[in-house]
Amino acid sequence: MKAAELRNLTNEELMNLLEEKKRTLMNLRFQNVLGQLNDHSQISKTKKDIARIKTILRERELGVRR
């Protein structure tokens, strides 16, 4: 997801999405260990999505506008 799309979501929606992405990352890591993961780039994409969500939540906490 792009940061602009994420900024249109509410804090509650972002928190729910963050939990979903964390579960997805955990599942991807398990699949990777078991050798079932075909597209390894999904792990880094999911980690970057998590970072984007956390950044937007922190910006809102500090009152930073973008």
Curated annotation (Swiss-Prot):
<dbReference type="GO" id="GO:0003735">
    <property type="term" value="F:structural constituent of ribosome"/>
</dbReference>
<protein>
    <recommendedName>
        <fullName>Large ribosomal subunit protein uL29</fullName>
    </recommendedName>
</protein>
<dbReference type="InterPro" id="IPR001854">
    <property type="entry name" value="Ribosomal_uL29"/>
</dbReference>
<dbReference type="GO" id="GO:0022625">
    <property type="term" value="C:cytosolic large ribosomal subunit"/>
</dbReference>
<keyword id="KW-0689">Ribosomal protein</keyword>
<dbReference type="GO" id="GO:0006412">
    <property type="term" value="P:translation"/>
</dbReference>
<comment type="similarity">
    <text>Belongs to the universal ribosomal protein uL29 family.</text>
</comment>
<dbReference type="InterPro" id="IPR036049">
    <property type="entry name" value="Ribosomal_uL29_sf"/>
</dbReference>
<dbReference type="Pfam" id="PF00831">
    <property type="entry name" value="Ribosomal_L29"/>
</dbReference>
<dbReference type="InterPro" id="IPR050063">
    <property type="entry name" value="Ribosomal_protein_uL29"/>
</dbReference>
<keyword id="KW-0687">Ribonucleoprotein</keyword>
